[in-house]
């Protein structure tokens, strides 16, 4: 049996529940990974919070039997995308992975695609295309938090075409994704101005960025830090208008959070949609050689009450780095 954390209805962290399920069996091109660590991300609580609820209404109209069939219980939906662990089973036509391999990966799916299991499970069934080898020098906790951060950061920088000599503003620079964006941009020869709380100023300096505090007077503080800004990556949301006022061309403004201002200023909605699984391997290699670090804010065990507490902390919005769920 495997333990799975998921939800059957939309709401706050209280909708998360734990269930014992049969061990997944890998099909063609699939593997099962015994999870050792799994990072959590804001998209997770947005999903179980009901961001896709309008789509559910459409489905109900089209297929009412899915919801109202007598005695039928709603399926448990999986939570989580990031993971790292040890391969415990392989399916047919899997030639480059064997049982015992240490891997990390990302469960990739569109938000409207219901997953019976996410990465918050003791055993994860996934396509072999969703995993990459874990470098031996990288801990499971760090590897387990890399998937979304690495793919999103690489995708965002690709989208806005960050190059050597650029001056890049990163909003939410102290977060899990923002910290990786900051380091990758600097590794390309760009200068980074990081927007974060004053408490994270020293942390951003340690990454090589120039910190500026959010709040009233932000635009002026950025102008004082850099006479000209050439690119803007918004990992927090709501900064497209600021980027426009700073004179950044719309095609060089990327945001991870869609808002009406994106269309108004011809900015770009970016992130994982512009990333690939190979980006995760690239960043994992950089973590292994020390050129990129992933800060782990806190770890919680894979127990439903602890997972609820982890998401509650993440929802507070002031996490430095990543929160990771661990299993033995």
Where are the regions a protein language model picked out?
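Cytochrome P450 core scaffold surrounding the K-helix E-X-X-R motif
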Residues: 43-45
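Mid-domain Rossmann-like dinucleotide-binding core that forms the NAD(H)/NADP(H) cofactor-binding site
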Residues: 144-214
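Glycine-rich cofactor phosphate-binding loops and adjacent beta1-alpha1 units
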Residues: 193, 206-270, 277
């Amino acid at each position: 049996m495997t333990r799975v954390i998921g939800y059957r209805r939309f709401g706050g962290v209280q909708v998360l529940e734990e269930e014992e399920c049969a061990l997944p069996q890998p099909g063609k091109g699939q593997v099962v990974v015994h999870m050792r660590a799994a990072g959590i991300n804001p998209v997770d609580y947005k999903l179980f919070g009901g961001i896709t609820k309008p789509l559910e209404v459409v489905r109900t109209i089209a297929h009412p039997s899915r919801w109202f069939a007598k005695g039928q219980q709603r399926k448990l939906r999986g939570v989580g995308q990031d993971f790292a662990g040890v391969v415990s089973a392989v399916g047919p036509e899997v030639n480059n992975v064997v049982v015992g391999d240490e891997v990390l990966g990302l469960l990739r799916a569109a938000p409207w695609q219901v997953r019976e299991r996410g990465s918050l499970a003791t055993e994860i069934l996934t396509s072999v295309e969703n995993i990459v080898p874990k470098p031996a020098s990288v801990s499971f906790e760090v590897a387990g938090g890399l998937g979304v951060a690495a793919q999103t950061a690489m995708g965002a920088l690709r989208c806005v075409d960050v190059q050597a000599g650029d001056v890049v503003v990163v909003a939410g620079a102290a977060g899990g994704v923002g910290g990786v964006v900051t380091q990758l941009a600097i590794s390309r020869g760009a200068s980074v101005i990081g927007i974060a709380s004053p408490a994270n100023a020293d942390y951003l300096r340690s990454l090589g960025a120039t910190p500026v505090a959010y709040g009233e007077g932000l635009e002026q503080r950025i102008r004082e830090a850099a006479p000209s800004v050439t690119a803007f990556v918004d990992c927090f949301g709501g900064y497209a208008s600021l980027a426009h006022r700073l004179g950044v061309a719309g095609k060089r403004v990327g945001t991870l959070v869609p808002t009406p201002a994106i269309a108004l200023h011809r900015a770009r909605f970016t992130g994982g949609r512009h990333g690939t699984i190979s980006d995760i391997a690239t960043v994992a290699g950089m973590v292994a050689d020390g050129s990129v670090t992933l800060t782990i804010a806190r770890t919680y065990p894979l127990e439903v009450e602890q997972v609820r507490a982890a998401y509650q902390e993440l929802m507070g919005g002031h996490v430095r780095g990543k929160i990771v769920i661990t299993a033995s």
